[in-house]
């Protein structure tokens, strides 16, 4: 009897887990009112509690963004829906992006719970399915397209390229931006290869294995350095990174660092898409010193990726074809704002005197003048003063001086 009760309790627990998974898989369609509301066709700046976009539209009123509603016209692909990618997807969803394409082959595990976004009851689901369900409930206005596969395989690579080149907001048009949020070099190089071949702008992000530093990088094929222009040592040495992993050893992971990296990544995405502020080509983050280094890297003319070299040549031709603008610098007159009486300083030395004291000016080409000349050497002339003898004695002269 006791065994039967125990089996029934186990069966109840199994059914409860299955029910939780089924509820997670019941993803509401766009416009079905995910999150308890219907789809909003047009963003409004009306300040009411029921408007999810009022705080975002305030950016336009404050002069930060000229047209925030334009964000609904963009499609962004996110490769890797882990600690950085899932938070990135959530932020873009809350910002009201037009469409998100999510790529990941992994499943949610309890070991992921130290990161952000995922919940324990989603364990066992694919990351893209779990993310889509949660994101649709946050904002049903966003369109989602999810792909549960590994982009590094030969079979899936062509499909991945097809979706980023034809999976835009309008079918047949490319996405506006690809975001790399993966945790291995093989996947980064795969994204780099695809984007170089298609001429697709993308942003790369990463967090260090000790979890206290990270970075983001904007890569415009031909204009800035691609991931293969200056690859990490593990890639340059052709080492199989799978051999670097050891049993029972994993990389450290902090939700704070991943949240910071995801935040600066999405901030850079918004500035790039909505054209405000300064877009960073490279921005690092060091949590130990709270240091944010920035830089820009030029592409390597000897890059191993032939498509990168091809994009560089096309970019040079594009720049050469631009009309050259001649910059004419006008000399500004010095204006003394506090000179009410029109007082002018006049030199006490005349031009003739200045010319006499100036040295010879060499014959120079047109447009070149000397800063100064060596003054002429003045000949020392000694003038002797003579006094005529008056014939008076010394006593007479002394007497005259006393009478003065």
From Swiss-Prot:
Domain of life: Eukaryota
Motif annotated as UFC1-binding sequence (UFC), chain positions: 389-404
Clinical disorder: Developmental and epileptic encephalopathy 44: A form of epileptic encephalopathy, a heterogeneous group of severe early-onset epilepsies characterized by refractory seizures, neurodevelopmental impairment, and poor prognosis. Development is normal prior to seizure onset, after which cognitive and motor delays become apparent. DEE44 transmission pattern is consistent with autosomal recessive inheritance.
Source species: Homo sapiens
Protein function: E1-like enzyme which specifically catalyzes the first step in ufmylation. Activates UFM1 by first adenylating its C-terminal glycine residue with ATP, and thereafter linking this residue to the side chain of a cysteine residue in E1, yielding a UFM1-E1 thioester and free AMP. Activates UFM1 via a trans-binding mechanism, in which UFM1 interacts with distinct sites in both subunits of the UBA5 homodimer. Trans-binding also promotes stabilization of the UBA5 homodimer, and enhances ATP-binding. Transfer of UFM1 from UBA5 to the E2-like enzyme UFC1 also takes place using a trans mechanism.
Protein name: Ubiquitin-like modifier-activating enzyme 5
Nucleus as UniProt keyword: yes
The keyword Cell membrane is assigned to this record: no
